[in-house]
Amino acid sequence: MKFNDVYNKHHKIIHHLLKKYNISYNYDEYYQLLLIKMWQLSQIYKPSSKQSLSSFLFTRLNFYLIDLFRQQNQLKDVILCENNSPTLTEQPTYFNEHDLRLQDIFKFLNHRERLWLKLYLEGYKQFEIAEIMSLSLSTIKLIKTSVKRKCQHNFK
């Protein structure tokens, strides 16, 4: 499928996501980044998959936008920490509670479990994770169960 067709049918997803997160200040920049990502996703989409193109694009673009927000916050934190200017250090630093919890969870997971959780949070389906990690679907299900068990045990 040509990207022009994909764009004409699905460009409203980008506008919806930007409106959903109340993006107004850097609207054009985020729009361009999401448009580039949409092109990349249109290249890797497999029509034979069970997921429709629109839901595939929406899910992946949504998580990509969240990743962009996280990168932007990390960049601000690095600038704040590296610059010893009194005006910068007087400003309060806000931590994303979600990121802090993920860091706590990652501490007690092994490498495969961390990779599974990272891919799962990025929106990949179990069969896609199995392909990426080169493991069987049953092994992926065991890893998922192990992660759930560890999370429940450590975060009661």
UniProtKB/Swiss-Prot annotation:
GO terms for biological process, alphabetical: DNA-templated transcription initiation
GO molecular function: DNA binding; sigma factor activity
Top-level lineage group: Bacteria
Pfam families named in the record: Sigma70_r2 (PF04542)
This protein's record includes keyword Cell division: no
DNA-binding region positions on the chain: 126-145
SUPFAM superfamilies: C-terminal effector domain of the bipartite response regulators (SSF46894), Sigma2 domain of RNA polymerase sigma factors (SSF88946)
Keyword DNA-binding part of the UniProt annotation: yes
Keywords: DNA-binding, Sigma factor, Transcription, Transcription regulation
Segments carrying motif Polymerase core binding: 29-44
Entry's family note: Belongs to the sigma-70 factor family.
Role: Sigma factors are initiation factors that promote the attachment of RNA polymerase to specific initiation sites and are then released. Sigma-S contributes to the protection against external stress, thus playing a role in cellular fitness and survival.
The protein's name: RNA polymerase sigma factor SigS
